[in-house]
Amino acid sequence: PNKQRMEEYPQLTQMWKSPNGTIRSILDGTVFRAPILIDSIHPVVKNWKKPITIARHAYGDVYKSVDMYTTEPGECTMTFRGESGEEKTLLVQKVDGPAVWQGAHNKEKSIRSFARACFQYAIDTRQDLWFSTKDTIAKVYDGEFKKVFEEEFESYKAKFDELGITYFYTLIDDAVARVIRSQGGFIWACKNYDGDV
């Protein structure tokens, strides 16, 4: 529930996490959303001739994030403490008044699992695979997704070539424009929040 739901239902004892997000996190997998085509229902985008399957990473991002609101000037830092005792600290931002903050994460193991599931699904369904992030802005976070997909693709490239299907990476804003212009018929792999939207 959100704050409004808490007011509507006073029997709620706390703002529980999303049940769907909790289940997806436990499964640590990929959600594939493939449309069901019905002749009498036409797509809103007239040039879509084939279905577009959304492959959504089912772990992390804002769904496992923490956030807070602060009321005064100050600075926010992010610190990682390794089991070895090593610490890494980054300045998030200095602010001159009230601010809202959010810290998100993802695990490399989960990103790899997501990439493999996407490549295998593309092979199983014989469809091209598109993947999009915003690594020009989130250079480390989204850059890790891009890097992992590139590394994992090496294991699937020969099979993709054999089937005549392709793997394509682009920035998410470019991907949206391309999707609208496309005829469909591919899998679009998205990070957790992007796939939700």
Indicate residue ranges for each PLM-predicted region.
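Glycine-rich phosphate-binding loop
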Residues: 1-3, 156-197
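Structured catalytic/translocation cores of nucleotide/phosphate-coupled proteins
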Residues: 21, 60, 79, 84, ...
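Beta-sheet entry/capping signal
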Residues: 51, 126-130, 186-188
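Conserved active-site and cofactor/substrate-binding residues in soluble primary-metabolism enzymes
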Residues: 14-21, 49, 106-113, 140-148, ...
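Glycine-rich phosphate/diphosphate-binding loop of Rossmann-like nucleotide-binding domains
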Residues: 78-170
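N-terminal glycine-rich phosphate/adenylate-binding segment common to multiple enzyme folds
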Residues: 1-87, 193-197
